[in-house]
Amino acid sequence: MATLLQLCQPFDHAVMAAIQQLSGAMMDKIMLVFTFLGEETFAILLLIAVYWCWDKRIGEYLLFSLYTAMSLNGLLKDIICRPRPFLNDEFSDLRYVKVKGLLVDTEHLSSSWSFPSGHSQTAGSIYGSLINGRKLGIKVCGIAVILLVMLSRVYLGVHYPTDTIMCA
């Protein structure tokens, strides 16, 4: 798998460079909001809200989905051991949005692996589960959130595109 990801580096670099051309102070803030939608903390709060305010069975289903995704994510990160783009010399020409605060913990990011993207996997498991069997409007919104979380992780420079594509 690591060799396959290595072969994807030219693709990853080209896509990251194209996405980061959108950069700016306002876009940084927008992308941080999209990233927050893939945070485990937000997913747990959403799960609790669904359980208590909407449907207990769906809340339990989301809990199982999130737990499974989080467990697999940690296991895969430890098996693949792919460094983050901002730690990869081949990607040194790209930007990395350094933010102090709750949303992006740079110390944690520097000591954790890139593949697979936990935010994208969380978004895929939660929003993907929520759209299952729903009306078209809900499906479109769920898919949009998943894609925006994936985009935000690449834009912020904390994941390669393949990290987000292969796990969402």
Task: Describe each region flagged by the PLM.
Residues M1-A43, N73-H108:
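N-terminal transmembrane-helix/juxtamembrane module of multi-pass inner/ER membrane proteins
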Residues L37-E40, L62-L63, G137, C141-A144:
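Alpha-helical transmembrane segments
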Residues G38-T41, L63, Y67, Q121, ...:
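Residue-level signal for the membrane-embedded core of alpha-helical transmembrane segments
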Residues L46-L47, C53, N88-A168:
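Membrane-embedded catalytic cores of phosphoryl/pyrophosphoryl-handling enzymes
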Residues V50-W52, L66, I80:
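Short glycine-rich, polar/acidic loop-and-turn segments at beta strand-coil junctions
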Residues R57-I58:
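Membrane-interface helix-loop-helix junctions at transmembrane boundaries of multi-pass membrane enzymes
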